[in-house]
């Protein structure tokens, strides 16, 4: 590329000389930019054959080659010389069975074999002939008693037997005649103080509270304030007294009447036996009742409102009480 720039500069200078007859050398120009790479040239021709190179190092041994084809059978070799006995070879495979040899001599008798299993029972044989009479056997045991013979004549009277055992006690005889009065005996020693017999007991007193006042009608009143129930004969859950000691009892009730009328009944085993009725007149009032009842074991006694909710004015608070009491007067046992 630089050659082209030089030729161009020379041409310009020559033209200027011809026109002006004189030419002065100018300052060198600024170097141009490098040109682009030209196209690659064609491959050169093959050079002449070079000299033979030095021998290379031996290569690594090659792998085993494939088996060649089986060659033709060779001619028999000459007889070899007998050498020393070789090593015993491995045992060959078993050959085919040989032909049967001649029958051998009879061997000695073998030992007695084990007893064989019992064979099945054979068929019943025919009856044999009667054998000769055997010798007389020993005397047999006594046979059973024969039937009773005829009654013989009465024998002579025997000797008296031994005395028999005493017979059972006879019946009691009639009372004898009363004997004369005996003499007065001496005064005995003072006895010890005896223990008092344990008397059966049963008693309770229960009352209403602010929560249980104005009880529902036609059902046992459940008194939930326990004043006395040591023996547990009053059942708080059911409102009933249950008899655990048969006898005669006294039951009583005291009622504070307020806000409504009252009508109550004392009930024994479902039957009403005592009734009390009181009307409310605008101020507190008191009503009561009491009765003596004979009871058997398991009998039930309770108090209930009758006549509906208009007659359940049984009242209780911290200053007023409604109570139900019962206790045993005496047992019947």
From Swiss-Prot:
Give the record's keywords alphabetically.
Collagen, Repeat, Secreted, Signal
State the Pfam families in the record: C1q, Collagen
Q: Where is the composition biased (Low complexity)?
A: 26-40, 130-157
Keyword Repeat appears in the UniProt entry: yes
Q: Which cysteines are joined by disulfide bonds?
A: none
The residue ranges flagged as biased composition, category Gly residues, are: 59-68
- Domain C1q positions: 197-333
**Sorted alphabetically, which InterPro entries does this protein's record hold?**
C1q_dom, Collagen, Collagen/C1q_domain, Tumour_necrosis_fac-like_dom
Gene symbol?
C1QTNF9
The lineage, from the top, is:
Eukaryota, Metazoa, Chordata, Craniata, Vertebrata
Q: In which residue ranges is the amino acid composition biased (Basic and acidic residues)? A: 42-57, 69-88, 183-193
Grouped into one coarse class, the protein's main location is secreted
The entry's protein name is: Complement C1q and tumor necrosis factor-related protein 9
Q: Which organism is it from?
A: Bos taurus
Q: Does the keyword Magnesium apply?
A: no
Write out the annotated subcellular location: Secreted
Q: Which residues form the Collagen-like domain?
A: 24-82, 84-132, 134-193
A Gene Ontology cellular-component term: collagen trimer
């Amino acid at each position: 590329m630089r050659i082209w720039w030089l030729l161009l500069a020379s041409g310009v200078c020559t033209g200027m000389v011809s026109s002006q007859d004189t030419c002065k050398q100018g300052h060198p120009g600024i170097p141009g930019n490098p040109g682009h790479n030209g196209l690659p040239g064609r491959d050169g021709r093959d050079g002449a054959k070079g000299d033979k190179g030095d021998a290379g190092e031996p290569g690594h041994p090659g792998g085993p080659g494939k088996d060649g084809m089986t060659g033709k059978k060779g001619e028999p070799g000459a007889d070899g010389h007998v050498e020393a006995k070789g090593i015993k070879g491995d045992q060959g495979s078993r050959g085919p069975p040989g032909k049967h040899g001649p029958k051998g001599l009879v061997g000695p008798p073998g030992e007695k074999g084990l007893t064989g299993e019992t064979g099945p029972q054979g068929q019943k044989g025919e009856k044999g002939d009667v054998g000769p009479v055997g010798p007389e056997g020993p005397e047999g045991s006594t046979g059973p008693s024969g039937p009773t013979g005829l009654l013989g004549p009465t024998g002579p009277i025997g000797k008296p037997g031994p005395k028999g055992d005493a017979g059972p006690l006879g019946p009691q005889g009639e009372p004898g005649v009363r004997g004369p009065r005996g003499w007065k005996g001496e005064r005995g020693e003072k006895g010890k103080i005896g223990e008092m017999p344990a008397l059966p007991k049963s008693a309770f007193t229960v009352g209403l509270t602010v929560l249980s006042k104005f009880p529902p009608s036609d059902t046992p009143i459940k008194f939930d304030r326990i004043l006395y129930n040591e023996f547990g004969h009053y059942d708080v859950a059911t409102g009933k007294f249950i008899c655990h000691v048969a006898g005669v009892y006294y039951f009583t009730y005291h009622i504070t009447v307020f806000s409504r009328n009252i009508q109550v009944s004392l009930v024994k085993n479902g039957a009403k036996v005592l009734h009390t009725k009181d009307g409310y007149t605008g101020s507190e009032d008191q009503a009561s009742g009491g009765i003596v009842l004979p009871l058997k074991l398991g009998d039930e006694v309770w108090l209930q409102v009758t006549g509906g909710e208009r007659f359940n004015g049984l009242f209780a608070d911290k200053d007023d009480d409604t109570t139900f009491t019962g206790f045993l007067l005496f047992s019947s046992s």
